[in-house]
């Protein structure tokens, strides 16, 4: 099986069961640089000089 393909329809997000939404409970903050393949897409707002996390992913 080709690992570069996805089983779902292109351009349509998968439905999630809201009752079984994933959460991290009792986790710990990671040191900067300890997970170099992880990315965080953030939006910077000038009016309050803050960044907001939008989504994340991993570099393959």
Swiss-Prot record:
GO cellular component: acrosomal vesicle
Catalytic reactions on record: Preferential cleavage: Arg-|-Xaa, Lys-|-Xaa
InterPro entries: Peptidase_S1_PA, Peptidase_S1_PA_chymotrypsin, Trypsin_dom
Keywords recorded for this protein, A-Z: Disulfide bond, Glycoprotein, Hydrolase, Protease, Serine protease, Zymogen
Residues glycosylated per entry: 3
Annotated GO MF terms: amidase activity; D-mannose binding; fucose binding; serine-type endopeptidase activity; serine-type peptidase activity
Record-listed E.C. numbers: 3.4.21.10
UniProt-listed GO biological process terms: acrosome reaction; activation of adenylate cyclase activity; proteolysis; single fertilization
Top-rank taxon, per record: Eukaryota
Activity regulation (record text): Inhibited by SERPINA5.
Enzyme class of the recorded protein, top EC level: hydrolase
Keyword Disulfide bond carried by entry: yes
One Pfam family per UniProt: Trypsin
Ubl conjugation among keywords: no
Stretches assigned to the Peptidase S1 domain: 24-60
Family: Belongs to the peptidase S1 family.
Function (record text): Acrosin is the major protease of mammalian spermatozoa. It is a serine protease of trypsin-like cleavage specificity, it is synthesized in a zymogen form, proacrosin and stored in the acrosome.
Note, other: X's in position 19 to 22 were introduced by homology with the pig sequence.
PANTHER family documented for this protein: ACROSIN, ACROSIN-RELATED
Protein's recorded name: Acrosin
Organism of this sequence: Capra hircus
């Amino acid at each position: 099986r080709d690992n570069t393909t996805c089983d779902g329809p292109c351009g349509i997000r998968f439905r999630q069961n809201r009752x079984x939404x994933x959460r991290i409970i009792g986790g710990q903050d990671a040191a900067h640089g300890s997970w170099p393949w992880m990315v965080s897409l953030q939006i910077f707002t000038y009016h309050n000089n803050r960044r907001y996390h939008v989504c994340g992913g991993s570099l393959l």
